[in-house]
């Protein structure tokens, strides 16, 4: 079993959950039973160094000298597609996560409906993010149009896409989107975007910015006398404040701004591990006990990655044959600690869909906390706070 993870570089904090899960589950991964036979399993971890070129080389090493039958990966707008493309080219099965499925397909030069032979993914869609955010917008009275703070890179291009970006979902719900203008990351200022926000009287803002860029935008909007009633932001804002930015006060500032985000996993999700029955709450507690760090959303998905890999090796016609493992993944339906992963009926081939709920960064006794404030897509997830618009 091969793993490509960002152990170093700017994405390293997001590799921590996968490294932790591999350590925690090591005793359960030493062997798999398949068809009455036991097979020893070796786990080989390679560092992507948070770089697409290094990630491709990591796959080549796993496929060649390590002889991996399966590769797992997560994290990185540029790095994850590099891993999956390299696996496709090398003819090695791959399971990945933490990337909207439309971005997963588009970043690889394909269209929805395309079938990859070797690579499988589980996540949510941009349409799911739009639906969760629209649910939150509709709970804010008299907020007007939605200002879209989107960058000039892959995220912004996809969010603007006329078929699978935000517009098809939000226009059907009668929301008016106002593009505030593309910007380059990291931004050095948002005066033009703030001007458009004022011009259109938008009381809501949605974004996929880094925490640092979003805080800068909010600061400059306030300096101009503007205070959006609600800001919704995906991407980096889904992670705890201690893991996302070298400026620890940024998340306190964004909690003051009442920034809302998406939630794909939390300690309150009603799921258990297929390996040992561990609940989401137990996994989050163990992570804090063992690392001293707060739980973070990728933790549950990292665990589900490993569950999926072990399942595929257990049910494949021949776990030592890559084609058999890929075929097993294609037919997988598995209840995991991240929910039911079903690759037989996804929105497009090779995809298993995860539902989203709405969250908001709020002040807590230990600093900013991510509260679940909307659960219409998954009522089994308990609410842990009320949506609080800025005043």
Q: PLM features: residue spans?
A:
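Extracytoplasmic "Venus flytrap"
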Residues: 2-23, 46-52, 155-156, 272, ...
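Beta-alpha junction/loop-to-helix N-cap segments that form part of ligand/metal-binding clefts
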Residues: 13-20, 31-106, 187
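Short, charged, surface-exposed loops that flank catalytic or proteolytic processing sites
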Residues: 39, 296, 314-328
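Short beta-strand elements at the ligand-binding edges of bilobed clamshell
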Residues: 47, 106-135, 182, 248-264
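Periplasmic-binding protein-like
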Residues: 62-77, 95-97, 147-150, 200-211, ...
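Extracellular/periplasmic Venus flytrap/periplasmic-binding protein
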Residues: 117-225
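Extracellular/periplasmic periplasmic-binding protein-like sensory domains
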Residues: 224-303, 384-390
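Solvent-exposed, acidic/polar segments of extracytosolic/periplasmic ligand-binding ectodomains
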Residues: 333-391
């Amino acid at each position: 079993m091969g793993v490509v993870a960002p152990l170093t570089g700017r994405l390293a904090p997001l590799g921590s959950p996968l490294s932790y899960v591999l350590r925690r589950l090591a005793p359960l991964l030493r062997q798999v039973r398949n068809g009455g036979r036991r097979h020893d399993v070796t786990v080989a971890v390679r560092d992507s160094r948070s770089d697409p070129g290094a990630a491709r080389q990591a796959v080549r090493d796993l496929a060649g000298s390590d002889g991996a039958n399966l590769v797992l990966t997560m994290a990185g707008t540029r790095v994850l597609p590099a891993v999956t493309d390299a696996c496709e080219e090398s003819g090695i099965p791959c399971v990945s996560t933490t990337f909207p499925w439309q971005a997963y397909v588009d970043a690889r030069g394909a269209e929805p409906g395309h079938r990859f032979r070797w690579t499988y993914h589980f996540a949510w869609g941009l349409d799911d993010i739009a639906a969760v955010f629209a649910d939150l917008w509709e709970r804010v009275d008299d907020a007007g149009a939605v200002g879209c703070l989107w960058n000039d890179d892959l995220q912004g291009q996809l969010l603007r896409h006329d078929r699978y970006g935000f517009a098809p979902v939000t226009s059907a719900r009668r929301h008016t989107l106002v593009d505030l203008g593309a910007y380059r990351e990291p931004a050095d200022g948002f005066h033009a975007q703030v001007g458009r926000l004022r011009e259109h009287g938008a009381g809501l803002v949605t974004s996929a910015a880094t925490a640092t860029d979003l805080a800068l935008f909010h600061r400059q909007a306030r300096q101009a006398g503007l205070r959006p009633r609600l800001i919704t932001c995906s991407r980096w804002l889904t992670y705890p404040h201690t893991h996302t930015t070298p400026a620890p006060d940024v998340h306190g500032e964004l909690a003051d701004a009442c920034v809302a985000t998406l939630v794909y996993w939390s300690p309150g999700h009603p799921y258990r591990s297929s390996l040992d029955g561990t609940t989401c709450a137990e996994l989050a507690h163990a992570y804090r006990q063992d690392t001293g760090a707060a739980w973070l959303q990728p933790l549950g998905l990292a665990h589900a990655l490993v569950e999926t890999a072990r399942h595929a090796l257990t049910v494949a016609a021949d776990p030592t044959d890559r084609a058999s493992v890929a075929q097993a993944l294609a037919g997988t339906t598995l209840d995991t600690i991240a929910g039911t992963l079903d690759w037989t009926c996804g929105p497009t081939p090779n995809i298993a869909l995860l539902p989203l709920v709405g969250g908001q960064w709020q002040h807590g006794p230990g600093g900013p906390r991510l509260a679940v404030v909307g659960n219409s897509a998954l009522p089994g997830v308990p609410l842990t706070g009320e949506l609080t618009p800025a005043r």
